[in-house]
UniProtKB/Swiss-Prot annotation:
Protein name: 4-diphosphocytidyl-2-C-methyl-D-erythritol kinase
Signal peptide: none
Reaction(s) catalysed by this chain's protein: 4-CDP-2-C-methyl-D-erythritol + ATP = 4-CDP-2-C-methyl-D-erythritol 2-phosphate + ADP + H(+)
Residues in coiled coil: none
Length: 290
């Protein structure tokens, strides 16, 4: 029997640290980031079908979806007109800084490569990923990675210990391009401490990471959406929360929490405040087959 469908779990990411190191002549920002897979995922089903590419993802359906564009690039490279249906069950919030669209695109590439019996090498898939968006390369790899360039150049780091996380997202999101524009007005370029991150991660203790949490986009996004600053400040007051940071360009804020029980208690407080809340943890790897 010929396999005609592959299912993937596409995992979200957080940025444990993000420094903007410069701006290229083409306008893209260069960065250094410690990127980390977490246990929130979208479920992706990719099916060989008739009638071109179709992408079903609620209000995010159609050609603008990054998974659709991933399928377009994949088929174009093969010179194939095979019909593809992509169904995405969305759990990762959008405009949150959690890389949901990038995770879906990476999962689509991986599923298609399996369906077509691996016509592309890992390096060739990375090349597609770089064309699609800065976070897609990380989502292909997953785990704990040091990202440079515009986010597409990856270097492995020691796996993060299993860290209990609470994620809180305001109703309003932050547009990534707007966050970078706001940074350009007032932000200053900086660098992360690679050796410090290696040492902290190798220690296996969540507490070791707290002094290194950092995000150059945080002040810019907080200016666009001041509620982010309030969420972070309130989260830091909760019993068991060791540290908190906005992920990516926001608007989601994550808290590193000592125990899962404490994380659930913190989540209950924020649910009573009518916030979008998730209790999750770090993952040693990224997307997996269903």
């Amino acid at each position: 029997m010929i396999r005609n469908q592959v299912e993937m779990f596409a995992y979200a990411k957080i940025n444990l640290a993000l420094a903007i190191t410069g701006r290229r002549p083409d306008g893209y920002h260069e960065l250094e980031s410690v990127m980390q897979s977490i246990g929130i995922y979208d479920r992706i089903r990719v099916t060989l079908a008739e009638g071109g590419i179709q992408c079903s993802c609620g209000e995010w359906s159609g050609p603008e979806n990054l998974a659709y564009r991933a399928a377009e690039a994949f088929l174009s490279g093969l010179g194939s007109s095979q019909g593809i249906h992509i169904d995405i069950e969305k759990n990762i919030p959008v405009q949150a800084g959690l890389g949901g669209g990038s995770a879906d695109a990476a999962a689509a590439l991986q599923a298609l490569n399996k369906l077509f019996k691996e016509p592309y090498t890992e390096e060739e898939l990375k090349s597609f990923a770089a064309q699609l968006g800065a976070d897609v390369a990380f989502c292909l790899k997953g785990g704990t990675q040091w990202a440079t360039g515009v986010g597409e150049e990856l270097k492995g780091l020691p796996h993060a210990p299993k860290i209990n996380l609470v994620l809180i997202k305001p109703d309003q999101g932050v547009n990534t391009a707007e966050a970078y524009r706001a940074f350009d007005q007032e932000g200053k370029f900086s660098h992360l401490d690679y050796a410090g991150w290696q040492e902290a991660l190798a220690s296996g203790r969540a507490e070791s990471l707290i002094p290194l949490l950092y995000n150059d986009l945080e002040p810019a996004s907080m200016k666009l959406l001041p509620e982010i600053a309030w969420v972070k400040e309130e989260l830091m007051k909760q019993n068991g929360c060791l540290g908190a940071l906005m992920s990516g360009s926001g608007s989601a804020v994550f808290g590193i929490v000592q125990t899962e029980e404490q994380a659930e208690k913190i989540a209950a407080i924020w649910r009573e405040r009518n916030y979008h809340v998730w209790v999750t943890h770090t993952m040693e790897r990224g997307n997996i087959y269903g």
